[in-house]
Regions:
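Mixed-charge, glycine-accented linear interaction segment located at domain edges/termini
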Residues: 145-207
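Solvent-exposed edge beta-strands and adjacent loop segments
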Residues: 18-97, 145-160
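Short amphipathic beta-strand/extended segments with alternating polar/hydrophobic composition
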Residues: 43-48, 137-143, 180-185
Length: 207
């Protein structure tokens, strides 16, 4: 075992921190509008809450390439192009429609206008899944949403609320980062501030 040069500091023992055995639930969905700077670097505004979370799913994007030799798969590689996702919520917030989708709100009449020239903004998307020990918080850094559809149904003996679904693509950033998530060893300072500011470590991995 390697000698601890700083006896007053305990080595990090992951087993000291509880890990979730199961995952359930979805809550605390937030988004932060991104601005692209020089070299494609993204900077983020203050996170805004997106209430009414019903479900969120992510499907990996990327291809697996296989090279055959000696009558077998000699080499295989997979490209990580991020995720394709869907987010189902109770209702699309007006602020999200204006700030992200690009709809135009007339402040005099209060009428919302969708135009053919509107372009969705890139956002960071944050959310958390609960667990038997502690909720795991996630952030996707380079998300582009598609214009949502709309639908409605007549009332029957029981009223079933209609939800809205957003489709989106979460691509890697120019630094190659797709997603980050908290763990059982995440510091309280980082965990508690997850929805205050988009988490960006000082050291960025090489893409």
């Amino acid at each position: 075992m390697k000698e601890n040069k700083y006896p007053m500091l305990m080595p990090l023992d992951i087993q000291m921190f509880g890990e979730n055995k199961v995952r359930f639930g979805l809550k605390n969905v937030h988004y932060a509008v991104a601005t692209e700077g020089a070299g494609g670097k993204l900077t983020y505004g203050t996170p805004e809450r997106y209430p009414g979370a019903v479900s969120l799913s992510l499907e990996p994007r990327g291809e697996t390439s296989e090279f055959y030799a000696d009558d077998r798969v000699y080499y295989a590689t997979t490209v990580n192009n991020g995720y394709e996702g869907t987010y189902e919520a109770a209702e699309l917030p007006l602020k999200f429609r204006v700030d992200v989708i690009g709809d135009q709100l007339d402040e005099t009449t209060g009428v919302l206008t969708e135009t053919a020239n509107s372009k969705p903004k890139t956002i960071a998307l944050m959310f958390e899944f609960d667990g038997d020990v502690k909720a795991t918080r996630h952030v996707l850094y380079n998300v582009t949403v598609s214009r949502p559809g709309t639908s409605g149904e007549t009332k029957t003996e029981s009223t079933e609320p209609t939800t809205q679904e957003l489709s989106f693509i979460a691509a890697p950033t120019v630094d190659g980062v797709v997603k980050r998530a908290t763990t059982g060893t995440t510091t309280p300072e980082v965990y508690d501030a997850w929805y205050t500011k988009v988490f960006e470590p000082t050291v960025v991995p090489t893409p």
